[in-house]
């Protein structure tokens, strides 16, 4: 089959026509999408009808509980450091401790709420009940799949599985599908066109599946979606945004759309995508963590988000008119990386939709929503660098006029997530510096296994209390997730049983601890690069299993390994007990090359799967749509 003929329309669009004469785009139905002002605007509806009862008390619990626990821990830390006065370094340590402890405490408080929601079946809203028969739909929804230099075979295999799953619901006539390409390289464009034409031929769906490739991909993904809204959005009451690796069941899609129909003041409903398809050790570890820890985290944030939920950019249904009226993103003033197009657009779009008077919700209990994770730590960190820039860019948006205070909180949490990495690093360096510059401290005296030895008048008991309480707050979400899983017999068995789940959690915790210093270092570097004005660019994501050569690993992590050895040697010079306390960080940095290499292997992931480690229900009992995706991808492999 020949490639598609192209007819230039205007300055920025290419409408394409199959050589059989079948148009690949429907008639246009324009919908105005004005650019929103960040300097003017007001919150249209302060309290939403669909907000849960007692939402103010929920938020008071989160913020008040975080502040109370943080103040208690800070007071104890101050008491530990107070005898003899506090010097500049100790003051820095106290401030860093206060902010970091508050950070982990807020996560703990949210996870605790999520635990009770999971165990006792709370958090259901918007009338969505997965157990009742499917409701009948009365409106039209467009499924949008933006793509940029993705493998079209993988992409359209997922789309075909979704199409077939929707057909099984008997309500396919309420949906159209759009593949929205921003690919710049011609080989990708031609491959997309060939696979699209073949898909339409297989399904007989020329009038339901459409393809558009932009000649000018201004605005990246956000611009891609906005272009579709302005050209075709008027024909659809809802749009469902999918990533290139997203898969959803027809049942889940119909229930989400039905919830939009029955709640006319709701502008966005975010599902909880389950991470699937991983084969490397790293990918399987990540998807196991998302499966076991993800529910209590998602239920927790949904519990206090209420009708001001966040948006993750995919696997969510959006009211098209609400999006068009309120989510047109302006270009930010100034140079990149802080100026230009909004990178992490999803947070901002949700905030603007909420400012416009529409509710935004998350429904973590609705199953049948899937995505894939990066295959290696390297791939995750490449993507994370772009997210870092996008979140720090929100510093220019968080003060925008009229935003709900919870929307501002979402952005501040995103910014804080990346600043915690250099703060942890500074905490470690200050901890080394204190005994080095301490007045009258004999570095050769004693072998006490406690940092209390380095501060005059301090007791081991107080320091160990702080350490124990901090570790409890850090690890409690994992323990709560394990206990919550024990209350769910099907999920417990599908994950390999209680013992294998516990072993998996222990192994995941060890591997995560070894990789944490790598993440800390590279996130810190990313923050400093953004602050120095370095742009992240826009590259295609790695979806298949990554293959990392030793030369690439040494180039990426060799310097970090040397730094880890130097820090370890310095700590040992100060005191062997201090080196012992710092060993988790030092070992993670020093052995970063073999750790990343080991976790990037498919063979290790396969062996652990045979042993029942890191199992998830989607591996032991995959849904029909996931089975179909795997079949289609195998069939399209050369």
UniProtKB/Swiss-Prot annotation:
Stretches that traverse the bilayer: 60-82, 97-119, 415-437, 464-486, 499-521, 578-600
Record-level Gene Ontology MF annotations: hexosyltransferase activity
Source species: Xylella fastidiosa (strain 9a5c)
Cited Pfam families: Glyco_trans_2_3
Region forming the signal peptide: none
Underlying gene: opgH
Main location: membrane
Keywords assigned: Cell inner membrane, Cell membrane, Glycosyltransferase, Membrane, Transferase, Transmembrane, Transmembrane helix
Function recorded in the entry: Involved in the biosynthesis of osmoregulated periplasmic glucans (OPGs).
PANTHER family noted in UniProt: CELLULOSE SYNTHASE CATALYTIC SUBUNIT A [UDP-FORMING] (PTHR43867), GLUCANS BIOSYNTHESIS GLUCOSYLTRANSFERASE H (PTHR43867:SF5)
One term under GO cellular component: plasma membrane
GO biological process, one term: glucan biosynthetic process
Membrane association type: Multi-pass membrane protein
Keyword presence, Ribonucleoprotein: no
Top-level taxon in the UniProt lineage: Bacteria
Cross-referenced SUPFAM superfamilies: Nucleotide-diphospho-sugar transferases (SSF53448)
EC number: 2.4.1.-
Protein name: Glucans biosynthesis glucosyltransferase H
UniProt record similarity statement: Belongs to the glycosyltransferase 2 family. OpgH subfamily.
Root EC class: transferase
Subcellular location: Cell inner membrane
């Amino acid at each position: 089959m020949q490639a598609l003929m192209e007819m230039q329309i205007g300055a920025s669009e290419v409408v394409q026509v199959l050589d059989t004469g079948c148009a690949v785009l429907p008639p246009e139905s324009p919908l105005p999408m004005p650019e929103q002002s960040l300097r003017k605007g007001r919150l249209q509806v302060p309290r939403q009808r669909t907000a849960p009862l007692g939402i103010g008390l929920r938020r008071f619990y989160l913020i008040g509980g975080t502040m109370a626990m943080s103040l208690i821990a800070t007071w104890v830390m101050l008491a530990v450091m107070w005898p003899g006065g506090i010097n500049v370094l100790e003051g820095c340590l106290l401030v860093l401790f206060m902010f970091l402890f508050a950070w982990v405490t807020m996560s703990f408080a949210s996870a605790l709420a999520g635990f009770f929601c999971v165990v006792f079946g709370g958090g259901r809203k918007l009338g969505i009940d997965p157990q009742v028969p499917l409701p009948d739909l009365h409106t039209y929804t467009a499924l949008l799949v933006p793509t940029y230099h993705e493998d079209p075979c993988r992409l359209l295999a997922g789309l075909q599985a979704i199409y077939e799953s929707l057909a099984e619901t008997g309500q396919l006539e309420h949906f159209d599908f759009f593949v929205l390409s921003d690919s710049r390289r011609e080989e990708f464009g031609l491959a997309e066109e060939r696979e699209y034409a073949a898909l339409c031929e297989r399904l007989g769906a020329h009038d339901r599946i459409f393809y558009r490739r932009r000649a000018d991909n201004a605005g990246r993904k956000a611009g891609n979606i906005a272009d579709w809204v302005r050209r075709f959005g008027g024909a659809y009451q809802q749009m469902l945004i999918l990533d290139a690796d997203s898969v959803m069941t027809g049942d889940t899609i119909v229930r989400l759309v039905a919830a939009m129909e029955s709640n006319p003041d709701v502008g966005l409903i975010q599902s909880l995508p389950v991470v699937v398809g991983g084969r490397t050790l790293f990918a399987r570890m990540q998807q196991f963590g998302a499966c076991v820890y993800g529910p209590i985290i998602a239920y927790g944030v949904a519990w206090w988000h209420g009708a001001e939920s966040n948006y993750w950019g995919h696997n969510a249904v959006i009211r098209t008119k609400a999006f068009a009226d309120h989510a047109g993103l302006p270009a930010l003033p100034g140079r990149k990386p802080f100026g230009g197009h909004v990178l992490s657009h999803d947070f901002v779009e949700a905030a603007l939709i909420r400012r416009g008077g529409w509710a935004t919700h998350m429904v973590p209990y609705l199953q049948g929503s899937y995505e894939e994770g990066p295959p290696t730590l390297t791939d995750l960190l490449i993507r994370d660098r772009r997210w870092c820039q996008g979140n720090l860019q929100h510093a220019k948006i968080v003060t925008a006029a009229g935003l709900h205070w919870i929307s501002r909180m979402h952005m501040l949490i995103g910014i804080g997530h990346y600043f915690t990495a250099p703060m942890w690093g500074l905490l470690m360096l200050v901890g080394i510096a204190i005994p080095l510059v301490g007045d009258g401290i004999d570095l050769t005296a004693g072998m006490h296994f406690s940092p209390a030895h380095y501060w005059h008048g301090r007791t081991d008991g107080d320091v160990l209390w702080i350490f124990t309480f901090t570790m409890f707050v850090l690890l409690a979400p994992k323990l709560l997730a394990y206990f919550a899983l024990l209350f769910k017999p099907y999920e417990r068995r599908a994950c390999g049983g209680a013992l294998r789940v516990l072993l998996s959690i222990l192994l995941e915790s060890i591997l995560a601890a070894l990789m944490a210093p790598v993440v800390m270092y590279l996130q810190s570097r990313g923050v400093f690069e953004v602050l120095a004005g370095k742009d992240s660019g826009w590259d295609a994501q790695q979806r298949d299993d990554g293959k990392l050569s030793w030369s690439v690993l040494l180039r990426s992590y060799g310097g970090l390994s040397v730094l880890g050895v130097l820090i370890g040697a310095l700590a040992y010079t100060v005191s062997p007990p201090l080196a012992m306390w710092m060993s988790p960080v030092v070992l993670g940095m020093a052995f970063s090359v073999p750790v990343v290499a080991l976790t990037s292997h498919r063979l290790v992931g396969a062996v652990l799967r045979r042993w029942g480690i890191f199992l998830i229900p989607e591996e032991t009992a995959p849904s029909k749509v996931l089975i179909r995706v795997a079949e289609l991808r195998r069939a399209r492999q050369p």
